[in-house]
Regions:
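Flavin-dependent oxidoreductase catalytic cores
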Residues: 1-412
Length: 412
C-alpha cells in the first residue's frame, strides 16, 4: 500500500466540492484500440475562444417549468444529468428576452437582472464538470401565450392562468392558427428598436451568468423567423417585402449582440432551412395558399443567401432541417459559404452514431440532438459504443465501468 497521500482533487473555482474532470466527460480517447483514428464526432472543435471536446451538442429543450421566468432545480437536474455525461455543448432552453416573448407562462426568461442568479447555478454546475454551456435567447412572437403542450397542443394561456392574449406581437397581424391563437399586434418601428435593445440586454445578462456561448433563436416559426417568412411578414416598411428587408431584423439583432458580448465568445444563430411549403404537393391547398411562387415562403434557397450574411456578422449557424435524412439542406447551406470558416450543424432526427458520423464526414461541423438526450442522458456514451470508440466518462460514473486507474496524486 502506498504511503503517498492521494487527493481527490477539487474542480477549480467552484463554490462547493466536486471532483475535477480532466479531461472532461465525452472526450475521445485517441487513437482507437485498433490503431485507427477516432471518428470525427469525437474530435474537438474550436469556435473563437472556446474548444468543445466533441461534436454532439444538446439542443435547447423547453421544460415549461419556470415561474415568472426564473429557472429552478428542475432545470438544474434536467440539464445536469445530461451535462455530466459529456455533450460537447449543452444549450439551455429558449429563454425569453421580453416577458411577452415566452411560449408559455412557465418559460425561462432573461428580461430582468434577478433571473441571472438561478441560471448561474446551472452554469457553475457545468463548469464544475469542465463542460461548456450555452443559452438560447428567443421571442415566441405570434406563438406566445400557449399552455404547456402536455395539457393541450392548441390552447391559449388566458389571463386567468398567467397568459397575455392581449399582448401578442408579430411582424404583421396574422395569427399562427386562425381561430385558435390570438391575432397579434404588428410591431411598430419603435417597438422593433426596443426589441433589439432588450435582446442585447438579455445577452449581456447571459454573459454575467457565465455562459460560454449564446444562441439566437430564429427558427420554428418564432418572432425572428416570422420576420424572415413572407407567410407571416406582410409589412410594407423597411422590415418587410424584399429578402433584404425581411432579413434586416435578424441581421441587425445578430450584429448588435455580437458587438455586446466578448470577442472570444461564440455566437450561434439557429434558423429553419425552410417553411416546408415549397415541398408540399403541387396543386395542394398548402402549395396554392402559401407557396404559389418561389418567394412566397421561406425557402432553402433563401437560407443559402442568408448564411453568408450571418457569417459576415460573426455567427455560426445550427440549421433546423428536419429529420436526419433531410439534413442535406444543412450540407447545401454549408457549401454556399465557400471559403468561410462559419460552422454549420444539422439539427433533428439524428439518432445513431453512423448517421452522425456520416453527416460530419460530408462536411458539417456539428450534429445536435434534443429528445434523444431526454430519453438517454448518456447518449454520448451510447454513440461512442456504436462507433467502437473509447470516451472519457465522468469520474464518478466511469470508475464503475473499468475506469479504476491510478488517481491524480498530490504529495502533502
Amino acid at each position: 500500500m502506498s504511503n503517498e497521500a492521494i487527493d481527490n482533487v477539487a474542480a477549480d473555482g467552484i463554490s462547493y466540492f466536486t471532483p475535477a474532470q480532466d479531461p472532461p466527460s465525452g472526450t475521445g480517447v485517441a487513437p482507437k484500440v485498433d490503431g485507427n483514428p477516432i471518428p470525427k464526432l469525437f474530435t474537438p472543435l474550436k469556435l473563437r475562444g472556446v474548444t468543445f471536446p466533441n461534436r454532439i451538442f444538446l439542443s435547447p429543450l423547453c421544460q415549461y417549468s419556470a415561474q415568472n421566468g426564473y429557472a429552478n432545480d428542475w432545470h438544474l437536474t434536467h440539464l445536469g444529468g445530461i451535462i455530466q455525461r459529456g455533450p460537447g455543448l449543452a444549450i439551455v432552453e429558449a429563454t425569453a428576452v421580453q416577458a411577452n416573448g415566452r411560449i408559455t407562462p412557465q418559460d425561462v426568461g432573461l428580461w430582468e437582472d434577478g433571473q441571472i442568479e438561478p441560471l448561474k447555478r446551472i452554469v457553475e454546475f457545468a463548469h464544475g464538470q469542465s463542460q461548456k454551456i450555452a443559452i438560447q435567447l428567443a421571442h415566441a412572437g405570434r406563438k406566445a401565450t400557449c399552455v404547456a403542450p402536455w395539457l393541450d397542443m392548441n390552447a391559449v394561456a388566458t389571463k386567468e392562468v398567467g397568459g397575455w392574449p392581449d399582448d401578442v406581437v408579430a411582424p404583421s397581424a396574422i395569427p399562427w392558427l386562425e381561430g385558435v391563437n390570438p391575432t397579434p399586434r404588428a410591431l411598430s418601428v419603435e417597438e422593433i428598436a426596443q426589441f433589439k435593445k432588450d435582446f442585447v440586454a438579455a445577452a449581456q445578462r447571459a454573459v454575467k451568468a457565465g455562459f460560454d456561448v449564446i444562441e439566437i433563436h430564429s427558427a420554428h416559426g418564432y418572432l425572428l423567423h416570422e420576420f424572415l417568412s413572407p407567410v407571416s411578414n406582410q409589412r410594407t416598411d423597411n422590415y418587410g417585402g424584399s429578402f433584404e428587408n425581411r432579413t434586416r431584423l435578424l441581421l441587425e439583432t445578430t450584429e448588435a449582440v455580437r458587438a455586446a458580448i466578448p470577442e472570444d465568445m461564440p455566437l450561434l444563430v439557429r434558423i429553419s432551412a425552410s417553411d416546408w411549403f415549397e415541398f408540399s404537393e403541387e396543386g395542394s391547398e398548402l402549395r396554392t395558399q402559401y407557396h404559389p411562387t418561389p418567394e412566397s415562403s421561406w425557402t432553402v434557397a433563401q437560407s443559402q443567401k442568408l448564411a453568408p450574411l450571418l457569417a459576415a456578422r460573426g455567427a455560426a449557424a445550427p440549421i433546423k432541417a428536419g429529420p436526419g435524412y433531410q439534413s442535406h439542406f444543412s450540407q447545401t447551406i454549408k457549401q454556399s459559404l465557400g471559403e468561410s470558416t462559419m460552422a454549420v450543424s444539422a439539427v433533428g432526427g439524428i439518432n445513431n452514431g453512423a448517421l452522425a458520423e456520416q453527416l460530419l464526414q460530408s462536411g458539417l461541423d456539428v450534429v445536435m440532438a434534443g429528445r434523444w438526450f431526454q430519453k438517454n442522458p448518456g447518449l454520448v456514451y451510447t454513440l461512442a459504443d456504436e462507433l467502437e470508440t473509447d470516451v472519457k466518462m465522468a469520474n464518478q460514473i466511469g470508475w464503475g465501468f473499468g475506469g479504476r486507474g491510478k488517481a491524480r496524486q498530490k504529495k502533502l
